């Protein structure tokens, strides 16, 4: 069963690189076999965090691992992990848009071409999640910077991701903080394009049903 990987794997034959941020945080990029030991961390964090608004996603660990292990073998995929000392506390993973497009339920590649955007030159950021206790340490920007550089070094000229937000939803927390200011600060803009995907979704009455969702597509050109 195909499912949409939510915003925010891994990867060519490169080993790992390390980029210090500020003590005690470090960003490391993993590819292919080097990424595999961290896939359970990624899968479980996705299940835990994406259960919350706005995704309300009911995850399955086996399905998560199957999808991550498949994506880990694709060309130019990369998993960037933020470490607090030696403990992983967040991640961002990227994949060429053309490799990821089968996860969408609508023809996103065709939509890009209609906008005169080149999907073959676009690197897609699938998920970014920071453990709640470690948010506010500039880790999101550092993770994006690391994988944007990785993508540019492999010839990609643009980057993209998707976001979902129900403006009025009974499960939306009163203190929910929109992330649009972060995306704009990273120089991404909404394209006006929409992607669609379906997943098991928590309902206000406590039930879980498979539901179709729409998401905004963001984009930017990568520059040195």
Model-identified regions with their sequence ranges:
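Conserved acetyl-CoA-binding loop-helix of GNAT-fold acetyltransferases
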Residues: 130, 136-152
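Conserved N-terminal entry element of GNAT/NAT acetyltransferase domains
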Residues: 8-9, 18-37, 44, 48, ...
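Glycine-rich phosphate/pyrophosphate-binding loop shared by adenosine-nucleotide-utilizing enzymes
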Residues: 25, 87-91, 123
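Active-site rim helix/loop that mediates acceptor-substrate recognition in acyltransferases
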Residues: 56-84, 93-96
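Conserved GNAT acetyl-CoA-binding A-motif
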Residues: 122-125, 151-175
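Helix-loop element at the rim of GNAT/NAT acetyltransferase active sites that forms part
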Residues: 43-59
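Conserved acyl-donor/pantetheine-binding loop and adjacent beta-alpha core of acyl/acetyltransferases
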Residues: 93-127, 196-209
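Conserved catalytic-core motifs of GNAT/GCN5-like acyltransferases
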Residues: 162-163, 171-204
